Amino acid sequence: MTTPAITKTRFAPSPTGFLHVGGARTALYSWLQARANNGEFVLRIEDTDIERSTQAACDAILDGMNWLGLTWDEGPYYQTKRFDRYHEIIGQMLEKGTAYKCYCSRERIETMREEQAAAGLQQKYDGHCRNLAARETNEPFVIRFKNPLEGSVVFDDHVRGRIEISNEMLDDLIIQRTDGVPTYNFCVVVDDWDMGITSVVRGEDHINNTPRQINILKALGAPIPEYAHVSMILGDDGAKLSKRHGAVGVMQYRDDGYLPEALLNYLVRLGWSHGDQEIFSMEEMKQHFKLGDINKAASAFNTDKLIWLNQHYIKTLDPEYVASHLAWHMEDQNIDTSNGPALAEIVTALSERAKTLKELAESSRYFFEDFTDFDEVQAKKHLRGVALEPLTLVKTKLAALTEWSVSVIHQVIEDTATELEVGMGKVGMPLRVAVTGAGQSPALDLTLFLIGKDRSEQRISKAIDFVADRINS
């Protein structure tokens, strides 16, 4: 009895741009297929397009994968470092007669295609050099795969079902260019074979490559992996996803204040479902994910849904963990957190209102920095002459405290209102504007507690002076 092969998947981006949401979703599905089956996940950088590939794009891909937490078991492998292996296999194919040198000039190929188009025929290589005898020449040549002339390629796609392509529709694919560089479709085949890939998850734009790659695998005597070609992501208007819909690099989502858990949860549901469940932890994704449950129809990107998920995770994840991500935004916004409350306390205090970590960081600034001016509208409304007495009394009571806690501060605010025989709002609103500079904050007792005793007293004094100047002006 033979032991079943371990499930092995790969994510193989080309480093010609950032890791966008479509690529990130493909990476997630491939990663989940491996993790759900106790398998292995390989990261491979397909950089054979030497002119367009950049190190910056490579770095962006790795940064995006790391930020998302999509860890890999092997790699990253780089195709440009495997040219010797590709040339070795091409040499073997030339010897076996499954590949051949093609000396057709560019002009001949163009003329051939024009004639085929004029005759209403499919434009494909006509096999002119397919059976040429070996010859010694300095003429430039490409190397082509000798595709079968009869029969068809059949494979069962997990998303699209049974697919059959006649070999008559396929031409003899170029597997090595005139400059000696192997082509993408060939390198992919050798890599998948060498790396033992059992499951290929990729975008539907690759589906036309699959029968060509299967034929090369058969010619090499290599096993055929299973395939799942996922549909494209559209904008909410039904058009192809673009920057105006949110098609930006994964790291831009970090910069905009999204948690990786929110983006992963959003992406997994963008074409896959498990009942009516909307919220998925990574463990739940691994538990329930199956390639066969991926939807065939294209999915529409909805930023509002992503924001909703982000709010959920900001509110429900461990505050210490959220704070570890918030720290990046505090630094990015030049907020010095060394003189103020712990970031986890800020997360707990502000998470109910925050849509993003970027927004949360900006709204927390007054906990760490003294503001120059009060909000003009709020000051005009609440820092008036009638606020002088409650601000003065509450400052006196706060200054006398020997214990600084939320409950004690709350009692001071209540006692001030009782003593002055006014409603809590007559004390609370001027006090809130005094210590935050604005009209919104978490619960006032918690806000003062987090700002701290000395800083709170200083700000109330500033507000008292502001009101006094206003009375005297």
UniProtKB/Swiss-Prot annotation:
GO cellular component terms, semicolon-separated: cytosol
Chain residues that bind ATP: K243
Residue numbers covered by motif 'KMSKS' region: 240-244
UniProt GO MF annotations: ATP binding; glutamate-tRNA ligase activity; tRNA binding; zinc ion binding
Major enzyme class: ligase
UniProt cross-references to Gene3D superfamilies, sorted A to Z: 1.10.10.350, HUPs
Similarity section: Belongs to the class-I aminoacyl-tRNA synthetase family. Glutamate--tRNA ligase type 1 subfamily.
Descriptive protein name: Glutamate--tRNA ligase
The encoding gene: gltX
